[in-house]
Amino acid sequence: MKRNSINIHHVTSFSSSPFWCVFFLVLLCKTSTNALVKQPPNETTPAIIVFGDSIVDAGNNDDIMTTLARCNYPPYGIDFDGGIPTGRFCNGKVATDFIAGKFGIKPSIPAYRNPNLKPEDLLTGVTFASGGAGYVPFTTQLSTYLFIYKPLLFLKGGIALSQQLKLFEEYVEKMKKMVGEERTKLIIKNSLFMVICGSNDITNTYFGLPSVQQQYDVASFTTLMADNARSFAQKLHEYGARRIQVFGAPPVGCVPSQRTLAGGPTRNCVVRFNDATKLYNVKLAANLGSLSRTLGDKTIIYVDIYDSLLDIILDPRQYGFKVVDKGCCGTGLIEVALLCNNFAADVCPNRDEYVFWDSFHPTEKTYRIMATKYFERYV
């Protein structure tokens, strides 16, 4: 076990027998998720409220000039309504937009910090998510990193999860002024809270920084992530949320940029990245199951997206895809955010043939499929 000397957060020791700990956690994960996958029957959903990273950011970083984790410029948004870049890290809608549409709430979930946000949008939900965010505070401080030959160029991040909660508190006060305290409490209680985060912690912070690997092993770092995710879910519960879904991390070792950087000459999926992700997901599911039992509230749910996306990657033709190892933007090998722009990168003519839009984020079609899979299992 490597000792923790970096000032990120205290990490509880992991067992000296990794095999049996992982085996136990897998069993606990299966028990917890099987018991908690469904939302309560006959519940209406007035709003969807989202926290997390670039997977569900809809433009909260647009005016933050200290980060490159923003995409409010073409070709981002090329397939969104009107072909306008919104700040979504995608060619069109993201998964939470499709989920909101399927619930019949609204066609898409706007960014809370959108200057054109209408008061009525607050009643049906917003996203506080920010590109570059992570469960480990240090992740958001790093946020975006560009591999420009050598060395790495590190830049300040977006909105940390702790700050996203501050924005949520501001949102609640606005709601109270609009509809009163009692209705605000009812909306929060019945709304669906979705937390989608963790990819940046694994790729950018742990595997991107040798100094972090020297002070944490995979077991202790994933424990840190899962413990912080549990704390975040508990905070939402304290705010009055009673329908909370915390999403696991996707198979980050298979996204195009990570294949390019660590997948070897043949750009294979990076096994050690995916193994770390799976270990984190198991711990996250176990933590959420434990939290639900502690609170006596069975509406805190772990949502798996690892298998959903991996199934698409491993069997793309089943879903109508042709390209899984490159993004649609530019060469598809490394372009993301600033490197994916109309001046330096061409866009593939048929986005629906690509699983990934840029080198890190899926296409609108992929998100649509994953939203459908989500509904089949969790709603």
Swiss-Prot record:
Transmembrane regions: none
Superkingdom, taxonomy of origin: Eukaryota
GO cellular component, one term: extracellular region
InterPro entries linked: GDSL (IPR001087), GDSL_lipolytic_enzyme (IPR050592), Lipase_GDSL_AS (IPR008265), SGNH_hydro_sf (IPR036514), SGNH_plant_lipase-like (IPR035669)
EC number: 3.1.1.-
Glycosylation sites noted in the Swiss-Prot or TrEMBL record: N42
Active site positions: S54 (nucleophile), D358, H361
Gene Ontology MF terms in the entry: lipase activity
Gene Ontology biological process: lipid catabolic process
Keywords (A to Z) from UniProt: Glycoprotein, Hydrolase, Lipid degradation, Lipid metabolism, Secreted, Signal
Annotated compartments: Secreted
Signal peptide: 1-35
Cross-referenced Pfam families: Lipase_GDSL
Record-stated family: Belongs to the 'GDSL' lipolytic enzyme family.
UniProt name for this protein: GDSL esterase/lipase EXL2
Organism of provenance: Arabidopsis thaliana
Protein's gene: EXL2
